[in-house]
């Protein structure tokens, strides 16, 4: 993590909140193939349930003291005592993670390939998370002065949850605070209490029934791939060119079942789909040398270009009359729609010089010029520089 001005100025306008430098795993040249399998099994739960909430007897006593006891059958209600923390949070939500990797190399090649699967139930009832991940890092020596490589990652993830509704009082976290202890979410036969038959006594929706009848699913695909070539045409000079592509595709599907009475026999569906593509090219030249074994110099110049594009759509229709046919085309009216588009580009030039005297004194200077389509029309370029001594 880079936070100081001297370290981050070389990254320009986008480094105002710091820079995170990530080093990916890779194999070692000349090392035999090594296969590694890891697995993780466990569970997650609410860190603490020691919340001082009223039970039914305390709630009844409170209502009597403040005059809210009119029309209440407390003899019947006193037989019900619901801890809503136990109803809307999973006590031990299971998780499982499996990872298989292979790494190694020859005299001219190193590689690291891995795949993983992660599955977890959320601590909130009705939520799940699933992810599949693949990664491949390969580097090869073309000759004595040139090496090429690629780092590629693909991720698929799926999230299931419930819509939180217009007011969110029946969302899991809110429900644990606002539902009263004598509001039983279940009938005597174990099925969910509903407003339809009067089995639900709450003044808002039954949170568990709402979650079941208003599901929301999200899916995300992400592909990040980087290709690079690094040359050392002469001693102490390193030239590197790198091209990366970051692509993401996200979809969501929300359904509101018409058979659920709070939906007023009026189903709904919402679909959204968004695509993002970020292309980046970076070229750098780095020259380092030493004089008299105590004076160390390092100079670097570079160029970077970024082209970003994001677009998608979101459509909501209402009027579905069948719980099975809750797609967009089954609705009678389109209640909302949108199609956002975002585009911008960057072009940057930068340089840095470093001096080190006998590992005792250090000085550096960096400068960067950023040109961006997001800057004002009267000033498309910005300069960023820093000087440091130590």
Feature-to-residue mapping (PLM):
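A beta-strand signature from Gram-negative outer-membrane beta-barrel systems
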Residues: 1-36, 95-97, 110, 116-118
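Short, solvent-exposed loop/turn segments at the edges of secondary structure
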Residues: 15-17, 276-278, 382-384
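Residues on the lipid-exposed face of transmembrane beta-strands in outer-membrane beta-barrel proteins
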Residues: 24, 100-104, 134-140, 225-231, ...
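Surface-exposed loop/interface segments of Gram-negative outer-membrane beta-barrel transport/assembly proteins
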Residues: 29-82, 122-127, 133, 137-222, ...
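Transmembrane beta-strand segments that form the barrel wall of outer-membrane beta-barrel proteins
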Residues: 39, 115-121, 363-375
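Outer-membrane beta-barrel initiation region
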Residues: 49-50, 56, 88-92, 102-106
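Conserved interaction-surface patches within small, structured recognition/assembly domains
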Residues: 95, 99, 119-120, 349-350, ...
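Extended, hydrophobic alpha-helical segments in both membrane/secreted and soluble proteins
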Residues: 134-136, 241, 281, 349-353, ...
